[in-house]
Amino acid sequence: MTKRTLEGTKRKSIRKSGFRARMATKLGRKVLNKRRQKGENS
């Protein structure tokens, strides 16, 4: 049987797009602030 096309690894995706990855850069912090202003996740 063939493998699935998308077999994501949790660790990689979290390191790439998790909260701490966002906080590490200026643009990432901007993203978080915009999301906080939108206020759908709180």
UniProtKB/Swiss-Prot annotation:
The keyword Calcium does not apply. Keywords: Chloroplast, Plastid, Ribonucleoprotein, Ribosomal protein. It is found in: Plastid, Chloroplast. GO terms for molecular function: structural constituent of ribosome. One of its GO terms (biological process) is translation. Gene3D superfamilies: 1.10.287.3980. Its main location: plastid. One of its GO terms (cellular component) is chloroplast. Belongs to the bacterial ribosomal protein bL34 family. This is Large ribosomal subunit protein bL34c. It comes from Olisthodiscus luteus (Marine phytoflagellate). The gene is rpl34.
